[in-house]
């Protein structure tokens, strides 16, 4: 009987560790998710670069140019090569809240 209890104790510890790891992984992996519905999209025109987009929208975000570029690359699954070869018509999410651009348009009208 004592051996059975000892064995059950090991199973309980094992399952507690698995549950804790699952919880931590859920928090860590879920933290990187971005709610894209909140962010603006832009349509690339000829000659656009991520650096130019950062400068164009600098009044609407609080990132450095490098942070802006990194955010756009990460969220849009771009690497440095694909970021260099943007094509007119490509649509990209940018780290500018939709409400920020909406407010700007309302002010200008």
Curated annotation (Swiss-Prot):
The entry's keywords: Cell cycle, Cell division, Cytoplasm, DNA damage, DNA repair, Septation, SOS response
UniProt key word Cell division: yes
Predominant location: cytoplasm
InterPro entries found in the cross-reference section: Cell_div_suppressor_YneA, LysM_dom, LysM_dom_sf
GO biological process, one term: division septum assembly
Subcellular location: Cytoplasm
Domain LysM positions: 40-94
Pfam annotation, one family: LysM
Function: Inhibits cell division during the SOS response. Affects a later stage of the cell division protein assembly, after the assembly of the Z ring, by probably suppressing recruitment of FtsL and/or DivIC to the division machinery.
Protein family (similarity comment): Belongs to the YneA family.
Protein name: Cell division suppressor protein YneA
Organism listed in the record: Priestia megaterium (strain DSM 319 / IMG 1521)
Gene for this chain: yneA
């Amino acid at each position: 009987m004592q051996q059975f209890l000892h064995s059950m104790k090991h199973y309980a510890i094992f399952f507690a560790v698995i549950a804790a790891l699952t919880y931590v992984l859920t928090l860590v992996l879920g933290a990187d998710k971005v709610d894209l519905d909140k962010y603006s999209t832009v349509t690339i025109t000829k000659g656009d670069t991520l650096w130019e987009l950062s400068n164009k929208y600098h009044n609407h975000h609080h990132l450095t140019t490098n942070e802006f570029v990194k955010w756009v690359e990460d969220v849009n699954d771009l690497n440095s090569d694909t970021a260099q070869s943007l094509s007119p018509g490509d649509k990209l999410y940018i780290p500018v809240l939709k409400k920020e651009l909406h407010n700007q348009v309302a002010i200008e009208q």
